[in-house]
């Protein structure tokens, strides 16, 4: 997911470098993939007794910049605010995309949006995530079910964020594509754009933003469960 699948859409792939490579592995294949990585000289710091249940396991290779993360789920199941996002991606049949086995284009765009949304409510996001979303939407426009995408985003209160991401990509980053109904192309994106530019590359450039994200995450969780936020009483 993300990474090289997105960088290949940039005019120059080196403009979209990745610190790691994220691989989504079905639970039934996870340990086999783990063993294969060890066979190829990679190592992990995750204790052996945690491998069977860990959502994410990281691997490095001595003398190499290679950094791989295996994921059982796209969103950490230990985070109450985001765990329910995983249901969008169950029982998906992968397709081959430029030599990679990946989610179909519609689901991958949904993932890019929800992944960016997760970072936004946690601490903030960077312009690169808007580039990823815009370039993917433009490249696979005809393969996206735009009505269903809107319904999916709306069901988790992310439709306004997604519309703003599309508008920033098109109006400010020059990644032009048609935004069909029911998407709102006239949304005011200035507050989100300002927040993005103030947040640094990854959005978390100061402790104040990281602290305030605790309140935001709690509100997101409450909005999905119908509960009252427990941070502000």
Walk through the language-model features, giving the residues of each.
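Conserved NTP-donor binding/palm subdomain of two-metal-ion nucleotidyltransferases/polymerases, i.e.
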Residues: 1-19, 25-233
């Amino acid at each position: 997911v993300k990474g090289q699948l997105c960088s290949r859409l940039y005019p120059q792939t080196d403009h979209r470098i990745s610190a790691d490579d994220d691989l989504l592995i079905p639970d039934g294949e996870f340990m086999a993939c783990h063993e294969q990585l060890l066979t190829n000289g990679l190592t992990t710091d995750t204790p052996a007794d945690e491998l069977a249940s860990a959502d994410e396991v990281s691997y490095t290779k001595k003398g190499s910049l290679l950094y791989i993360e295996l994921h059982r789920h796209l969103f950490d199941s230990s985070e109450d605010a985001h765990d329910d996002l995983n249901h969008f991606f169950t029982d998906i049949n992968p397709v081959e995309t430029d030599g990679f086995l990946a989610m179909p284009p519609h689901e991958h765009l949904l993932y890019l949006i929800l992944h960016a949304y997760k970072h936004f409510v946690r601490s903030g996001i960077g312009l690169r995530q808007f580039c990823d979303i815009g370039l993917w939407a433009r490249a696979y426009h005809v393969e996206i079910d735009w009505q269903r995408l809107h319904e999916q985003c709306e069901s988790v209160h992310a439709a306004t964020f997604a519309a703003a991401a599309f508008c920033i990509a098109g109006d400010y980053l020059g990644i032009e594509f048609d935004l069909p109904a029911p998407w709102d192309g006239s949304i005011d994106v200035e507050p989100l754009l300002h927040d993005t530019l103030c947040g640094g590359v990854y959005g978390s450039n100061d402790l104040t933003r990281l602290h305030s994200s605790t309140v935001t995450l709690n509100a997101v969780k409450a909005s999905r469960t119908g509960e009252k936020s427990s941070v502000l009483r």
